[in-house]
Each structure stands twice: as C-alpha cells, then as structure tokens.
Amino acid sequence: MDAGKKVKAFFDYYGGFEAIIIEHTVFMNSPKTAADLALVQGAILGSAGQSGTKIIGKVSPITWQNYLGNKKLTKDEQLAIRAKNPGKSVSWYKSYERNLRKERTMRLIDVIYDRKIADNDVADACGIGHWSLNNWEKAIGESK
C-alpha cells in the first residue's frame, strides 16, 4: 500500500506525533468518494500507530465548521444563490454552495490567525486544528 508507506515516511521524518485528530469520513452522495477517503484514513491511522502515535481523535466536518463560524447555508442564502443563477442543475448548486463554504473557511482562518491560505484542504486542516485545540477532551473522546 503506497499511501501507507508514504504517510509512515512522513511521520518518521518528523519524529512521529503524540496525537492526531482526523476528520470523520462522511457519506454524502458518492459511495466511491466515501470509500476512497476511508482507505486514505486507514493508511493514515495505521501509519500513525506504527510510528508511535498514542492518541487518535476525530471530529465530524459540521462540528468543526460550526465551531469556526461556518455553518450550513440558510434557506434564504440558498434561495439567493438560485435567484442569481437560475436554471442550473441540483449538482451545480451543491457544488457552488460547497465552494462558497470552502472560501468562507479560508477567510475565517485568515481572520483568526492572520494567515492567507489559498488551498481549501489546508484551510480545512487549520479549521480542524482550531477546533481540536479548543475542544481537546471532545476530540480525543474523553468527557470532563
């Protein structure tokens, strides 16, 4: 498994990590995407364990996004998008809304940390980290 070898090399290069927090795989509309994400997460978790990571936590996407201030679009926001872009397919609107929320995450990270992030995956990782630092017990599954 190439992904596992690469991730283990990454962990080993940086001397391992005491803890990692990973985003839950969420099944939305694509079973293939969910399966691919699960495989990648398995490679990450397996490699983390082999490299000595002792604490592995998790968070759902909507949890960290809400905490960051990037809640789901309201009905009014969705209707406004449809009014500005009439006649598009349902998948077009979903894609547009997803991209809008990704842009919001990048802006929020800039506001909170004064860092311009151009890659939405990096911004998501920052958002997960922000939530984790402020909700550590929840992230690792311990209750207060």
Write out the residue ranges for each language-model feature.
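Phosphate- and other anionic-substrate recognition elements at nucleic-acid/protein interfaces
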Residues: 1-144
